[in-house]
Amino acid sequence: MRVRNRKGATELLEANPQYVVLNPLEAKAKWRDLFGNDNPIHVEVGSGKGAFVSGMAKQNPDINYIGIDIQKSVLSYALDKVLEVGVPNIKLLWVDGSDLTDYFEDGEIDRLYLNFSDPWPKKRHEKRRLTYKTFLDTFKRILPENGEIHFKTDNRGLFEYSLVSFSQYGMKLNGVWLDLHASDFEGNVMTEYEQKFSNKGQVIYRVEAEF
């Protein structure tokens, strides 16, 4: 999600350290201390403008959520939503999520969300897809044994690729939805992209994969 630079984004992020972790490298292995409890920690990579991560935090007060995005302006809009929701169980990171081992200890998080990731449709860009095997290597490290990835996309090609990638990696597919919004799945929290795509009648795909 590319957005225009937002004036004052840096100042807004820096003014809210209760939600924005300003020194993420120092947070490694200390996330439960930062949240002040031992509740499960769920991470969304590429949290965009924050509709999903803030909605999940409000819906599940006994789970801690971390939203990650590389774009400062985007994350500042996510912070707007977090401030609006006003719940304590959420943190935001302005970092590149390509190597999460920089910010999380082995087994430190309990679930990972990949929502509407860039599909990188060209074959030569396969290694940039977040469900490529090298990313799965990283995700497996920071998740516990039997940790899960919950994945949503509107891109059929990326969905099919990811199913194959998960399976070839040896992961167990605990749930596959070929049309999420037409299913009986309960508790779905939509991202901004998801709302936009669903309003246009596009099918949303979902999978839960376990290491």
UniProtKB/Swiss-Prot annotation:
PANTHER family: 3-DEOXY-D-MANNO-OCTULOSONIC-ACID TRANSFERASE/TRNA GUANINE-N 7 - -METHYLTRANSFERASE, PENTACOTRIPEPTIDE-REPEAT REGION OF PRORP DOMAIN-CONTAINING PROTEIN. The lineage of its organism: Bacteria, Bacillati, Bacillota, Bacilli, Lactobacillales. Belongs to the class I-like SAM-binding methyltransferase superfamily. TrmB family. GO terms for molecular function: tRNA (guanine(46)-N7)-methyltransferase activity. Substrate binds at residues 122, 154, 191-194. The gene is trmB. One of its GO terms (cellular component) is tRNA methyltransferase complex. Catalyzes the formation of N(7)-methylguanine at position 46 (m7G46) in tRNA. It catalyses: guanosine(46) in tRNA + S-adenosyl-L-methionine = N(7)-methylguanosine(46) in tRNA + S-adenosyl-L-homocysteine. It comes from the Bacteria. It is an enzyme of class 2 (transferase). PROSITE patterns: SAM_MT_TRMB. The active site is at 118. CDD domains: AdoMet_MTases. Pathway: tRNA modification; N(7)-methylguanine-tRNA biosynthesis. InterPro entries: SAM-dependent_MTases_sf (IPR029063), tRNA_(Gua-N-7)_MeTrfase_Trmb (IPR003358), tRNA_methyltr_TrmB_bact (IPR055361). Residues 124-129 are annotated as: Interaction with RNA. The keyword Transferase applies. NCBIfam families: PRK00121.2-2 (NF001080), tRNA (guanosine(46)-N7)-methyltransferase TrmB (TIGR00091). It holds the Pfam family Methyltransf_4. It comes from Streptococcus pneumoniae serotype 4 (strain ATCC BAA-334 / TIGR4). This is tRNA (guanine-N(7)-)-methyltransferase. Keywords: Methyltransferase, S-adenosyl-L-methionine, Transferase, tRNA processing. Its EC number is 2.1.1.33. S-adenosyl-L-methionine binds at residues 44, 69, 96, 118.
